[in-house]
Structures are given as structure tokens and as C-alpha cells.
Amino acid sequence: MINIIDDLRPWVPEEVESFIQQHAERYQSMSFDELESKAFSLIEAHEKLMDQQSIVLYAGTNVINPKAAKMLSSSIGNRASLGYPGAKYNKGMEHADQLEILLMSLMRQLFQAKYVEYRVPSGSIANLYAYMATTKPGDKIMSFSDAAAGHVTHHAEGAAGLYGLEIHEVPFDFAQMDVDPEALMIAAKKVRPKLIIIAGSMCLFPYSLQ
């Protein structure tokens, strides 16, 4: 058995590594059956905390639509589906073909979009795709700071920084939890960014931009 307790990683922050090692030591001594039982109990505890005892204001982790949950739990989500509709490498995916075409049609209508890319594995990769489509490394962008609930993929530590973008903050009125439109106009004229991102991980009210 690999002893993860001794497998220290120098690239991980010390306080994070300490937290992991503290709990890993406890799990290391458990049997497979005990680990399985613990996994289910942790899921139950999470659902109780987040679904019953909390009000979640982050839409990305809020209660999922029951219809969407049913679709996600279907076995079609476990199948490899490589290639475009009508030209799949994997057999038995003719229904997935139709679902993908249906989804493209739905998204075009919903967002009035000419093109739809639905195959991204996460929001972080989707944001990276957006950067690649609208900017190039070295370009300037403006985005919400961490204090204004800006997403990590809009920052130097995330996709924007890893892609090589120069990041500037969108002026924000913290008392109103809103964008400062006048200050943004002044800053944008000075910075001249290729892209301005008006989006936060927490949005209590519509942003004041007309």
C-alpha cells in the first residue's frame, strides 16, 4: 500500500498539505469497507449542511433542476462519445447524437447564438475557450477582483493568468455590491482592454450597466 502520509509535495502550500496529512492519517488506517461507509456518511452530511441547513447564493452550486438531475444520472452520461454527431467513434451513441443536435438547437434559440460549443468539461475550460476566442497572450482584460466575488478563472492564478493575459480590476462599489460605471469608463479608456468581464461568483442584484 502506498503511504500517502510520507508523500509530501513541496509544491502544495504548507497549511494545505498539513490539513491533508492530518485527515489522510486517519483514513489510512481504515479498511475498504470502512472507507466506503465513511464516504456515504460524508455525502449525507454534505447534503444536510448545504441542501437543508444553508441558503446558497452561488448559482453554480445551487439546487439543480430535478429534470437535469435525472438526465445527469442516466447511463448515457457514463458513455464515451468521441467525435461529431453522425460520425462517432463509439458504437451505440445514435441517441447521444440526437441529444447533442437538440442541445445545439436549443442553445442557439435561447442565446441567439450563431455557433454553439457544448462539449466543454467545466466552466473553467469554457472561460479559457472564451479567452482564446477573443484575446491572445499579452492582451489586457478587466475583471472583478476576488473581493468583488470575481471568479478565479478571471485572475492571475486561474485560466486568464495561465493563458498569459494582463489582468486589471473592474472598479466596484462595495457598499452597493455593484459595478461603478463611471469609474469603469475612465479605467477602460486608460487601460484599453481587449475584453471586459462583468461577472461575479456572487450576484445579489443586476449590475448597473446600460
Annotate the PLM regions:
Residues 5-87:
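N-terminal "arm"/small-domain region of PLP-dependent enzymes with the aminotransferase-like
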Residues 53, 110-114, 189-197:
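Short, surface-exposed connector motifs at secondary-structure boundaries
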Residues 62-63, 121-125, 148-149, 199-205:
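Gly/Ser/Thr-rich loops at beta-strand to alpha-helix junctions
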Residues 80-125:
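Conserved N-terminal alpha-helix of the aminotransferase class I/II PLP-enzyme fold
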Residues 116-120, 143-144, 197-198:
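General beta-strand structural signal in soluble alpha/beta enzymes
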Residues 135-151:
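Conserved PLP-anchoring active-site segment centered on the Schiff-base-forming lysine
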Residues 153-198, 203-208:
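PLP-dependent aminotransferase-class I/II
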